[in-house]
Amino acid sequence: GTQVQLRKSRIGFTRIQSVFISHLHGDHCFGLMGLISTFGMLGRTSPLHVYAPGELGPMLKAQMEMFCQGLEYEVVFHAVDTTKCQVVYEDKSLTVSSIPLDHRIACCGYLFREKPTLPHIKRDMIDFYHIPICYINNIKNGADWTTEEGDVIPNARLTTPAEKARAYAYCSDTAPFPELSTWV
């Protein structure tokens, strides 16, 4: 299913850096080995990070030893504690947190949050006030500009607001419970 959907969506397999698995029921994890194998056949060389309940670790290791010898890339397993909210992945633009879910077995959802970006510079104002490039980052970070004549140009005149950061919560296979709405 996963590989078919990726192909239908025209998402390049090489763009996938991480896989997040909520729990160890077959419809959520059986496709992982096929995906790993396909990545290998396509010549992947960059690491693939797998975030999942800790119980997957030994099974993944055994299956990798059995079916995926000779891969040209590393599969890095990250055990996720399904009992608490915690940051499991972070880079310069994204944070992924686990969300405990109420299911028959250990299960968590994932909250994907973009980090806020800086405001956009109004190029026409930069040109108009002859602001040197070396000051652009200060302005993006909220600084006003003082002209050679001593006039202070407010930051709001030099920038436009950044787009609002987006978030997506993946919460499947759970019974409703009150705390869930406060986490997402």
For each predicted feature, which ranges?
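Hydrophobic packing residues within well-ordered alpha-helices of enzyme cores
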Residues: L6, L32, L60-Q63, L180
